[in-house]
From Swiss-Prot:
Annexin repeats: 21-92, 93-164, 176-248, 252-323
Superkingdom to which the source organism belongs: Eukaryota
Gene: AnxB9
PROSITE patterns assigned to the protein according to its UniProt record, in alphabetical order: ANNEXIN_1 (PS00223), ANNEXIN_2 (PS51897)
Key words, A-Z: Annexin, Calcium, Calcium/phospholipid-binding, Repeat
Taxonomic lineage: Eukaryota, Metazoa, Ecdysozoa, Arthropoda, Hexapoda
Protein name: Annexin B9
InterPro entries reported for this sequence: Annexin, Annexin_repeat, Annexin_repeat_CS, Annexin_sf
Length: 324
């Protein structure tokens, strides 16, 4: 399953398939790194962070053939903590990885609503539906039912709408429809006492990104206000964050991810799970574009932020994935 099926636009990754590539040789290096006293973490990083996911899976197959052992099991027994988390993330195909991340966000202590928003708001229809299938196969319950059971109110309705994966993905703009939708959004929010959340939900969830950009332009022409400011005034909490994420992704998904990375490292502490998820999942898609946007917006390279903020072993893996 190719990344192009999830993101059908030309993007710049930072991780490319290794060439030349010998999975048997790589398996031998990993075996040596984990055999005997101690573990050679650097050798593990140099192999797994410099191969594409398809190659990593070929290495795992060669490892089992050569040594009669499961590579994932050996990695789990040798590694620990967040370093184990990032290495296992590298060994997980994208649909399963996102399914696991969603399950963790739903079933952990409290609900990680920002992770749910980030994943569901940035995937194509195909991506959402594929991940929903893997989720049900892996956990025995539908993604929709788990979201319903763990969220409430307007945010629950937003999640249920998103997980249907029914956004219009046709190209082209209908200007008359954009004007009508802009008026409907205004009437549902700033133009009345109280807010009709369902109108915002319906329009933001179903219209194509190209159409939404025209709607936002027409909204500003109509009201004199940016749609993001209107959402901030009319909503609060998780549903506000969800609607804003849709708007930001519509304007620039690259900028949205660069902002998420910055927020994961800014202030006290590091949101390691967010940092790992974005770096690993985007490394073979568009991390090259994201790191350029990060540099332009924050005046400092993504690599330098990671080096200063992340723990040593995790930081080395993530910097390796981020480097060209």
């Amino acid at each position: 399953m190719s990344s192009a099926e999830y993101y059908p636009f030309k993007c710049t990754p930072t991780v490319y398939p290794a060439d030349p590539f010998d999975p048997v040789e790589d398996a031998a290096i990993l075996r040596k790194a984990m055999k005997g006293f101690g573990t050679d973490e650097k050798a593990i990083i140099e192999i797994l962070a410099r191969r594409g996911i398809v190659q990593r899976l070929e290495i795992a197959e060669a490892f089992k053939t050569s040594y009669g052992k499961d590579l994932i099991s050996d990695l789990k027994s040798e590694l620990g903590g967040k370093f184990e988390d990032v290495i296992l993330a590298l060994m997980t195909p994208l649909p399963q990885f996102y399914a696991q991340e969603l399950h963790d966000a739903i079933s952990g202590l409290g609900t990680d609503e920002e992770a749910i928003i980030e994943i569901l708001c940035t995937l194509s229809n195909y991506g959402i539906k594929t991940i929903a299938q893997f989720y049900e196969q892996s956990f025995g319950k539908s993604l929709e039912s788990d979201l319903k059971g763990d969220t409430s109110g307007h945010f629950k309705r937003l999640c249920v709408s998103l997980v249907q994966g029914n956004r219009d993905e046709n190209q082209g703009v209908d200007e008359a429809a954009a004007i009508a939708d802009a008026q409907a959004l205004h009437d549902a929010g700033e133009g009345q006492w109280g807010t009709d959340e369902s109108t915002f939900n319906s329009i933001l969830i179903t219209r194509s990104y190209q159409q939404l950009r025209q709607i936002f332009l027409e909204y500003e022409n109509l009201s004199g206000n940016d749609i993001e400011k209107a959402i901030k005034r009319e909503f609060s909490g998780s549903v506000e964050k969800g609607f804003l994420a849709i708007v930001k992704c519509c304007k620039s998904k690259i900028d949205y991810f660069s902002e998420r990375l910055h927020d994961s490292m800014a202030g006290m502490g590091t949101k390691d799970k967010t940092l790992i998820r974005i770096i690993v999942s985007r490394s073979e898609i568009d991390l090259g574009d994201i790191k350029e946007a990060f540099q332009n917006k924050y005046g400092k390279s993504l690599e330098s932020w990671i080096k200063e903020d992340a723990e040593t072993d995790i930081g080395y893996v993530l910097v390796t994935l981020t480097a060209w």
